[in-house]
Structure formats: structure tokens, C-alpha cells
């Protein structure tokens, strides 16, 4: 198979092979392509063609032609599950919103798998949108610039499945993002590290319930039960119902 790292700007919209390559880093020079191939250099040309063809087909096919193609060439169910998690935790520095922070893999049969990473900008640390806690999960990002998610959601059964996954994450019976259970996990983790917070550097010696100070929604908290500022409660209010 072929593994790629998608760097900032990886919109899955432009099929140009000029955006694809292998990262080259020396002491004096760094070249990082938008689509950074993680396989053998001997396979690069074929991998470029495969990726370019995938991007071309994703953008050019419509209607049943697109539906049939994407069902064959992509693990759509995994992608929808993954995106439900992305949106639920408030991951704005992602593919849909910012063309960023994901890998993808084509298996030996040519099927595409989406692999996100870098979840530091979550749980109330909001930017590039007005409020990552209550942003519409059906219009999370830049549909025109990063078209894959929005195009999938034009297919009724995929949209319904995505909404189901969002609701499953919030459902009390699954013990995932339901506010009481989420807060209990946070408390358990805090208890585990509390005795180690004090350190000989004198830095970061306090546990605070605040998002990163450079975000645009500094009011968010993970503790408490206020619908005005608790991230879990506000996120639940934004989820469309089944």
C-alpha cells in the first residue's frame, strides 16, 4: 500500500502531481511537499498517479457515479466515524476546516483510508471559526475549498450515518462524550497526575480548567454544569438529532 502525510494545504481538490513528493531535509534546506509520500522512492511515480486519479475522480464525479466510485475506493464508514469524533471534540485544525493534520493510506486494493492526527486544538480551544463548541456539524469547514466531506454528505444514507455517529458519541449508554462520564474520566486522570504537578522547574505547576490562551473562546470549561460555558454541554446542543 501507499502511505501519505497530508501537510497544510492538502485539500484533496487539486490533482497536480507537483504537490506530491518525498520530504527532503538537510542542514541547510527543507522541502516539504503538500502530500508527503512515506513509502519507497521507487514507488513514488505510481503512488503519485494513484493519488492524482483519486483526487480527480472525487472532484469530477457526481450523482450515482460518485456514490458508486467512493463506496468502492474509500472506507466511507470509517471516515464518517472519524469525522463525527473530529467535530465532537472541536477539532478545527483538520481537513475540513483547515486542509491539515491527517495521513491517508491506499491499501493493496487501492482503497483510501483517512487517518487524522494532532488533536491539541480541541475541547474548547477554538480558532478559524466563531465557536468550535457550537459550530454546525453539517457545515463544519470550508466546503468549497475542502470538498470531500460535504460531497459525501450530499448522499442521504451517508449523511444519516454521520448524524447517527454524532448522536452515539453523545448517548449516555455508550459512555463516550456524555458530560457526566467525560467529567469523571477527567477527574480520574487529574487524580493520577496531581502529585506530579509540582516540579523543580517552577513552571506549569497548576492544573487549570481553561483552553489555550490564544483561542477565540476563552470562556470554555470542561468541569461544571453550566450550559453557558461547559464544552460538553454546548457541544451536545449543536448535534442534529437522528
Give residue spans per PLM region.
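Surface-exposed loop and adjacent secondary-structure segments within mature catalytic domains
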Residues: 1-54, 124-128
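Middle-to-C-terminal accessory/interaction subdomains
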Residues: 38-96, 101-242
Amino acid at each position: 500500500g501507499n502511505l501519505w502525510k497530508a501537510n497544510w494545504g492538502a485539500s484533496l481538490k487539486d490533482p497536480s502531481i507537483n504537490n506530491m513528493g518525498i520530504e527532503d531535509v538537510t542542514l541547510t534546506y527543507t522541502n516539504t511537499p503538500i502530500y508527503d509520500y512515506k513509502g519507497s522512492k521507487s514507488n513514488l511515480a505510481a503512488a503519485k498517479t494513484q493519488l492524482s486519479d483519486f483526487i480527480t475522480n472525487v472532484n469530477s464525479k457526481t450523482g450515482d457515479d460518485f456514490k458508486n466510485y467512493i463506496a468502492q475506493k474509500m472506507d466511507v464508514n470509517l471516515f464518517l466515524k472519524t469525522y463525527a469524533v473530529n467535530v465532537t471534540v472541536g477539532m478545527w485544525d483538520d481537513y475540513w476546516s483547515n486542509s491539515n493534520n491527517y495521513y491517508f493510506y491506499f491499501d493493496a486494493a487501492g482503497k483510501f483510508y483517512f487517518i487524522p492526527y494532532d488533536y491539541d486544538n480541541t475541547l474548547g480551544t477554538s480558532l478559524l471559526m466563531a465557536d468550535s463548541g457550537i459550530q454546525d456539524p453539517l457545515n463544519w469547514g470550508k466546503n468549497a475549498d475542502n470538498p470531500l466531506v460535504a460531497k459525501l454528505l450530499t448522499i442521504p444514507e451517508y449523511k444519516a450515518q454521520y448524524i447517527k455517529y454524532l448522536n452515539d458519541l453523545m448517548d449516555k449508554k455508550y459512555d463516550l462524550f456524555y458530560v457526566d462520564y467525560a467529567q469523571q474520566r477527567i477527574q480520574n486522570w487529574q487524580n493520577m497526575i496531581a502529585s506530579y504537578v509540582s516540579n523543580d522547574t517552577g513552571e506549569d505547576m497548576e492544573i487549570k480548567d481553561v483552553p489555550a490562551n490564544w483561542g477565540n473562546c476563552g470562556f470554555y470549561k470542561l468541569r461544571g454544569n453550566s450550559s453557558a460555558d461547559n464544552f460538553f454541554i454546548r457541544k451536545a446542543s449543536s448535534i442534529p438529532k437522528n
